[in-house]
């Protein structure tokens, strides 16, 4: 519609020798216009092409030759444009002329050229010309023309549009007549035009007075009625769309309401004081209070007043507080919601409202007595009969205008007489003066009320505020709206109303224009507020109740509601000095967290992809925290909560469907409540995520590969590249390395990927090749994983290919298994030790030597340190988990050649009570008394004996001897000899466990490392000679490294 026509030519009309961009050609075109002053079917195409050519020459002259505009102005060529319009020449000519004028004004850059075009008032004559606006194309080009002109407004050009002598501003008044046009693009253009006009009016008092006195009240009253009509239509759509069939229409209505609010906020941001006063008064008393706020109460009470449903009212009020930050407006609105009383409103009869509806300060949602177009024409033609109406589309309620006829004319005459008698200075009518006075009076009343309220609140203590918030019914104020807010949070069936209430509380507390005292008066959460010692107990209890309901197996609480509850609770009780929550509430919260743990246990290993869901949900929760602004833009939450994904509603905004979604929901609830519990207790998160980036091998890391199991291969990437690499498999990762030229036996990592995200397939026609694909974890459960490696690996022979495939495939299984065991530790489930290390089975007699986890110190030293000997691939059975402390025999060498390094992909964290350790290279003994934990007292001998593996037999402590047992070392050597040389496991330490004598099995707590305890509680292996002293109970080193067992206590001191 807005594109240029194909027939745009610069036209010499057959005379190709003439330069089309020249003054001479403009003179020729002027001669053409003078010969064709009357539009006919024969010459209309010629006239259109001529006008286009003139426009092109004017744009060229603006940049290159000012004499073009001198000639244009001298010959008064704009008159020809206007005469062509006035001849009723038809749709084609009107469209082409409007299009041409729009292009002309868009491309003029010099103000002098613009002055030429705007002089003589011809542009205003085109603006007020009576086009046929029933034609969509004419309407589109006309409103685009007005928008282009409004963008040219400044302190100088505005005088060409606003005439102070005739008190007329055609650009503005003609534009606002389309404020309620059915086409959304037209309405958006009108908003842009009005905003441009308001910005310029700040520096032009005469124009500001005109806008204020002649247009503000009619425009804003009609605009408010238009917005309210959309709101009622939106509410009807929600009430009749229980089956989610009209979501498209509902989304459009919500988007329209958001556009209205942003437009109103843009007007308020301009900060034109009187315009803001009039607009605030109309919004409060004609829309927000009578339609939005009063709909919160007495939903079942009938009446003639328009009313919307409770969810829609809460939803729209949340949008108001999220978007509009004008302090007088939001504070007055919040005052009514938090402390308002309906007695004054309902004491008024319908007759009183109708009789005083012309006054802006009366709170009623009522249709304006006149349409905007009629009000503007009456203001323009005071003392004259009403002029003929301009052909236009139907305004809201215009069909009733013709029915009023003589009665309305009589009312107009009476109004004119009243204005003539009571008008001051001949500018303002008495009605307008009264409206202005009402606005000022209302503002003064609000300020006096706020002042008196603040005086009453000055000496109120925190305890009194808490009591007032807890027992609102005992106060002197009746707070029906606030009571309704709390009551909506109590619904045990679902969270349909609760979600909107939480959004409203969040929006009010985060509104920049909100007075904090209003929120603190009832102890609502205020971000960045001063330190306090009390909080809103009723609200906190309701939030905790929501969390407890969410942790139930059949809970109807959506994830969005739960996350918002956690957010508001933290905002209430978490201060910079710590948590101020009472113990009873904290205990209830811990109970909800325990319920969430039990809920996840029900789904543990219930799905094959539980691990993937667990990590995806944690990633989604941390990467995409809730944005309440975006949540309130979604129309789908207006409909009752549904449990089917067929509606297309986001998972966090609906109920789960099926076991997979129930598992996802249970995991997310567990994460939220765990995170909230840790933050309120001031404890750091040490066990999540399961994989931390800082603990993984990264590209360009330099690793010690001495005695590591490496397989040479050729990597052919998808784009055809071919490189020589060595394949190495770690606990969690596979890596491609190349030798480091600076140090022998060291390698530089060129690629590292997680084993759990890897797929390995053979190549049909080549037994030496494997296709390996590693995907990057998806940002959301619904997005497709992105492959970070997709290549073919070619090995030297099929044997190495089989070994690599087996190592990768079984390494992937083992990596996933270890993470599942870490999840079990998170859920306080008993851990069953794995019988495989990287997929290779071990004898049953040695299965307990390879405990499932080992938590290493997470400090990574730089590769430039020459003392670092990182052999991350040498011992494939060193896995992260519950630590087994290692020490050195006191008879061995006083120093070791190297430390036992932490796994490069070791556990990202240990439990809160776990002590991380590495083998001390210079320590020769461990004295129990120097590191004894006060919580580790010797266990009572009356406790039942535990059930231990065969090789861990309890003997009397006094029979221990300082000589090491060589039988144990010999047994370990025999067991490892059956493995491939590259898979020889590192020597495991002798295990000493502090346990209860009556325990039947090992518990998770018994495998958690704590400092040493009393020597009488140490247990040693069968067959070892008696030790002379408890401190000397160490085994003989089997290889270069030796390990000494530290006792293991419980995790819970």
Curated annotation (Swiss-Prot):
What organism is listed for this UniProt entry? Homo sapiens
**Listed Pfam families:** CLEC16A_C, FPL
Sequence similarity? Belongs to the CLEC16A/gop-1 family.
The molecule here is called Protein CLEC16A
Q: Where is the composition biased (Basic residues)?
A: 381-392
Tell me the InterPro entries matching this sequence.
CLEC16A/TT9, CLEC16A/TT9_C, CLEC16A/TT9_N
* UniProt subunit comment: Interacts with RNF41/NRDP1.
The job of this chain, per UniProt, is described as: Regulator of mitophagy through the upstream regulation of the RNF41/NRDP1-PRKN pathway. Mitophagy is a selective form of autophagy necessary for mitochondrial quality control. The RNF41/NRDP1-PRKN pathway regulates autophagosome-lysosome fusion during late mitophagy. May protect RNF41/NRDP1 from proteasomal degradation, RNF41/NRDP1 which regulates proteasomal degradation of PRKN. Plays a key role in beta cells functions by regulating mitophagy/autophagy and mitochondrial health.
Q: Where in the cell is it found?
A: Endosome membrane; Lysosome membrane
Q: Which GO terms describe its biological process?
A: cellular response to starvation; endosomal transport; mitophagy; negative regulation of autophagosome maturation; positive regulation of TORC1 signaling; regulation of autophagosome maturation; vacuolar transport
Residues covered by the FPL domain: 51-198
Where is it mainly found? Answer: membrane
* Keywords annotated in UniProt: Autophagy, Diabetes mellitus, Endosome, Lysosome, Membrane
Asked whether the UniProt record includes Ubl conjugation among its keywords, one would answer no
Membrane topology, as annotated = Peripheral membrane protein
Q: Which disease is it linked to?
A: Type 1 diabetes mellitus: A multifactorial disorder of glucose homeostasis that is characterized by susceptibility to ketoacidosis in the absence of insulin therapy. Clinical features are polydipsia, polyphagia and polyuria which result from hyperglycemia-induced osmotic diuresis and secondary thirst. These derangements result in long-term complications that affect the eyes, kidneys, nerves, and blood vessels.
Q: Where is this region: Disordered?
A: 375-434, 452-471, 892-983
Q: In which tissues is it expressed?
A: Almost exclusively expressed in immune cells, including dendritic cells, B-lymphocytes and natural killer cells.
- One Gene Ontology cellular component annotation held by this UniProt entry: Golgi apparatus
Low complexity bias: where? 892-938
